[in-house]
């Protein structure tokens, strides 16, 4: 027995709004231990809606609809469900009274077309909407098929799910097991290389291990099905520990961890501070660091040294090196890092200089060439070269450059913790 999520609305197909409902419902189904293998998005078309229902009941026993419950002619979800199961609609007086009262509370008269929202299939139960005028239904139109409908407004859908849908599903025997996942995050290793390292773990059945790729990082999702969170964690933990052994310092965090949050935790642990000198990222590294609440404990500030004159005047970069090696070079990156550390008085100094594109590249210094400098508390400076590729756009190169700088600092801080 599994569920299928069906999101209704032409605006979803056109990309006018983000389909956050499917993400929420997918997470909630996992918490209840209800497997779901398909999510469908369909426009506001009666025949296509009925076609989707036909396909869905062939592969799922719980159909969860969002959207298409409004008062306008293109709100067709309830009508499509009723027609498919050849069941008439009837006006529910309690729903109609509730809608009328909600309009009265805001000093408005209910429009005639709102009566449409009081129509539900004969035999269906009402799924109340405390916040809006579009109630849903809970209906078992035939053996082995359960239908739940929700409005497309995320806040209304979530409230209805928590208050009514979860108790109903638990009453049907769901919720005795749960599906829990841990997302492990890695930098400095690609998805394919990571998959090779943990190849034997990808064959596990419970928990399962699956690789994913992100911009500049790779991930492994470990998913367990168990009767309790404690049991699920007991399945996940030994696999997680084995992955840590196999991947070493490439692992940087799990679940909601980010590079800025992890680096911030490290700096707090060692009671040290950092400052940044940026060229091609234009403040992006400082912005990342200050995303974290309380970052003023360890981030002192930065200098955006875009022009060579600023690199020389504020960071003390040697003019001869600028002339000989160019602004995008390891010697300049190292001097920028040491310069900002000394200028601001932080324990650590980080610098970034590179060619973000789309122009400015040459055969010897192509777009995507980036140098990072790290100055440590002892005044020792190390430089790192990255070639991020000529096909990436400017935003991606800038973002990856800032991430790589943070990752190099993270790795150095690991030695101190």
From Swiss-Prot:
A Pfam family of this chain: CinA_KH
Q: Which Gene3D superfamilies match?
A: 3.30.70.2860, CinA-like, MoaB/Mog-like domain
Top-level taxon: Bacteria
- What InterPro entries does the entry give? CinA (IPR050101), CinA-like_C (IPR036653), CinA_C (IPR008136), CinA_KH (IPR041424), Competence-induced_CinA (IPR008135), MoaB/Mog-like_dom_sf (IPR036425), MoaB/Mog_dom (IPR001453)
Q: Which family does it belong to?
A: Belongs to the CinA family.
Alphabetized NCBIfam families for the sequence: cinA_nterm, molyb_syn, PncC_domain, PRK00549.1
Name it. Answer: CinA-like protein
